[in-house]
Amino acid sequence: SDKQNSNFMYKDFEKTKSYHTSFINAQFTGTSLRAAHMKYCNFTNCVFTATEFIGTNLRGSKFISAKFVDCIFSGGVLDKANFKGATFSNCYIVGVSGRSAYNFPDDLSGNVVLPALPLQDTISKELSAVIEPLRENDYIRRSHTLHLKNGKINTLTIMILKEIYSNDQLVQLLPLLPKIVTTQFYTISHLKAFLKKAEKEAIL
């Protein structure tokens, strides 16, 4: 199918399946591709901003001259995907190997590359204590931004938020989220926007 020149803003494509779809020149902003299958698709010249590829299967897809800005790659399949001329800027690339892909850049300076998610014990007891009750909020829990299965916390999100906020600030701001989050959201970029609102509330 043909999705050329499309503009996807804050979309949720979790667990969707696309095969042999042309997304040439499309723009993806604040979009979640969590556990999606995007196999043998053509993403040539696409621009991905604050988009999350979590456990995404990208086998055989073309990302020729694509731009990735503020994106997250965690796990997933890049077999035979072609990244010729693609650029990555301020992205987090976690537990992803480009070895089975074609033309995946060797030099990823200006990005954060990690072999695995940060360990659970990198999160302070105080912070864990405010994150855990937020599971009761359906919007927050379903977003997967703070909580993972088996009672675990999304340590990557916390690491990213700590570039903006101190531990104490997060302990203060996170409990304000249930009042502010009134719609379903899917990405860390959206969570950051909610925290900005929480900051204003806290100042008031």
Identify the residue ranges that each predicted region occupies.
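Tandem repeat scaffolds
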Residues: S1-A129, E136
